A protein has these predicted regions:
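Non-heme Fe(II) oxygenase catalytic core, chiefly the N-lobe of the double-stranded beta-helix
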Residues: 2-232, 237-266
Length: 266
């Protein structure tokens, strides 16, 4: 087993993992990384410089590679998506969100490998949604536990040029993590991502959706990552939302993304 160092990035979320090469993991080292991942919700591995084959091999240790509707993947690498700078007008991730909530079984986790990054800007933020739930009053927890919300793929459909009704799915607003057993708020940006609760109108839903969203992303449960080329970051899509900040103009920002299939939220 490699001797790894796990250092918390904030009290609430995130850890930096050093002393390991993700392209050459033994079973014991992977087990230690998995434990840290489930505990800290997202991990940063500096200086990895992963090639696509290495990233795919590491991803497959976590489960089956996910392929999402409306996304075009890299030729020769099914499931590997090259993220490039689309310009601020076309950026669809500049809000707090979970990945692929418009499908019945959203991704379990996401792995990003930084290739070429701006000299400044282009940061990504993550928020601990366990804490967002746990810091609600008992009364609010009880009320939300029975609610389901509509999640749409409006933003990605618009960018993909798809007309008509965007794909959507209904999920519980409070979900239980299938591995840790902890409860997390499961929401998204009110309006275009989460327009309403199930069996409620948008007008009826919006005040509570706005309040939940603002409550969830309190600064005391957020980590903001300043990317360096070669970084690998992975996060748990069952208990964290993230936000990609587009403040870098036309500067080059290239990352490779792989996601792992998840289960239907309950």
């Amino acid at each position: 087993m490699n001797k790894i160092t796990v250092r918390a990035l904030t009290p609430s979320i995130g850890a930096s993992v050093e002393g390991v090469k993700l392209g050459a993991l033994d079973a014991e080292t992977f087990s230690a990384i998995r434990h840290a991942f489930l505990d800290r919700c997202m991990l940063v591995f500096p200086g990895q410089n992963l090639q696509p084959a290495e990233q795919m091999a590491f991803a497959k240790m976590w489960g089956d590679i996910a392929v999402t509707p409306m996304i075009t993947y890299s030729e020769g690498w099914p499931g590997l998506l090259q993220l490039v700078n689309p310009g601020k007008e076309m950026a669809i991730t500049e809000n707090w969100h979970y990945d692929s909530t418009f499908i019945a079984a959203p991704h379990a986790l996401t792995i990003l490998a930084a290739q070429e990054m701006p000299a400044a800007g282009g940061d990504t933020m993550w928020c601990n949604m366990y804490l967002a739930y746990e810091r609600l009053s008992p009364g609010m927890q009880r009320m939300l536990s029975g609610l389901r919300a509509k999640f749409t793929g409006t933003r990605i459909a618009r960018r993909s040029g798809i007309v008509g009704e965007p794909p959507h799915a209904f999920h519980p607003v409070v979900r239980t993590h299938p591995e840790t057993g902890r409860k997390a708020l499961f929401i998204g940006h009110p309006g275009d991502t989460v327009p309403c609760f199930e069996n409620m109108t948008e007008a009826e839903s919006r005040p509570l959706l706005d309040w939940i969203y603002e409550h969830a992303v309190s600064p005391d449960r957020i980590y903001r990552h300043i990317w360096q080329p070669g970084d690998v970051v992975m996060w748990d899509n069952r208990c964290t939302m993230h936000y990609a900040v587009h403040d870098h103009g036309e500067a080059v920002r290239n990352l490779n993304r792989v996601t792992i299939r998840g289960s239907v939220p309950v």
